[in-house]
Amino acid sequence: MIDITLPLTDIHRHLDGNIRAQTILDLGRQFNIALPAQTLETLIPHVQVTSTEPDLVSFLTKLDWGVKVLASLDACRRVAFENIEDAARNGLHYVELRFSPGYMAMAHQLPIAGVVEAVIDGVRDGCNTFGVEARLIGIMSRTFGEAACLQELDALLAHRENITALDLAGDELGFPGSLFLSHFNRARDAGWHITVHAGEAAGPESIWQAIRELGAERIGHGVKAVEDRTLMDFLAQQRIGIESCLTSNIQTSTVASLADHPLKTFLEHGVLASLNTDDPAVQGVDIIHEYHVAAPAAGLSREQIRQAQINGLEIAFLSDGEKRALREKVAAA
């Protein structure tokens, strides 16, 4: 189902949600950190979703073991490098990796700006080694409150030239976007693109707020948009992209089943929706699974899957020239 003549992208992919189980085991042993299991086979149920979680917050706890072993900046650098290696193995030409530096720093009180620098270094080394193009999106983890998000923002702004966009993720219901208006004003002043997790746990009003008040150019997940016809029209007319993550939305119980997922409806409505993974290591999936298994199960035709692939580059945070160069590179391969 993947069109090999077109660039393959993943623009909603959490770096800190893609820490390999083997790496968790390795770093746990290196830093003498107590883990819930001592072999790869027995560790996987603790760090990977093996059945549907009751809600988003329950799903997010699966990510915690990955960041609990980040006891040094070198460990952060390693997982960033491995994220690019994983992208290359999946056949991705372009990836936007998003990460929450405060979340990664928290367990071992690492310097947040140091985490940002380590991630930048690891991703750069990975791109040079594996030939994948990547951009970084900084996340503010709303779950930890406004002050913690301000610390993350300051750390990201210290490396603003290496960050492409700002995102807001975490507990959407408990910490609405309205709490973070000043944060996003600073991000836009820095010249960053804006994408926001919205309409995943909360309703379409959360998406409207992200667009109108935070300046979102893309929406992460956005499944509740289908509940508001005016919003659907607005998304299509204003070319505001939707970063769809099929398997993730089932695992978080955001959507009941793949057959119920709104991605097909988005595409039929002319919304620029794309296919992405979200947290590959935690979910136990990759981009190939999303195209070959999840998308057909969600009712997408071959042409709709191809359109989602086209949309992935169309709404990527790249210049028109960069998009054209990537298309030409893939076509010539």
From Swiss-Prot:
One of its GO terms (cellular component) is cytosol. Zn(2+) binds at H12, H14, H197, D278. Its EC number is 3.5.4.4. GO terms for biological process: adenosine catabolic process; hypoxanthine salvage; inosine biosynthetic process; nucleotide metabolic process; purine ribonucleoside monophosphate biosynthetic process. InterPro entries: A/AMP_deam_AS (IPR006650), A_deaminase (IPR028893), A_deaminase_dom (IPR001365), Ado/ade_deaminase (IPR006330), Metal_Hydrolase (IPR032466). Its cofactor is Zn(2+). Binds 1 zinc ion per subunit. GO terms for molecular function: 2'-deoxyadenosine deaminase activity; adenosine deaminase activity; zinc ion binding. It holds the Pfam family A_deaminase. The record marks H221 as: Important for catalytic activity. This is Adenosine deaminase. Keywords: Hydrolase, Metal-binding, Nucleotide metabolism, Zinc. The active site is at E200 (proton donor). Substrate binds at H14, D16, G170, D279. Catalyzes the hydrolytic deamination of adenosine and 2-deoxyadenosine. It catalyses: adenosine + H2O + H(+) = inosine + NH4(+); 2'-deoxyadenosine + H2O + H(+) = 2'-deoxyinosine + NH4(+). PROSITE patterns: A_DEAMINASE. Belongs to the metallo-dependent hydrolases superfamily. Adenosine and AMP deaminases family. Adenosine deaminase subfamily. SUPFAM superfamilies: Metallo-dependent hydrolases. The gene is add.
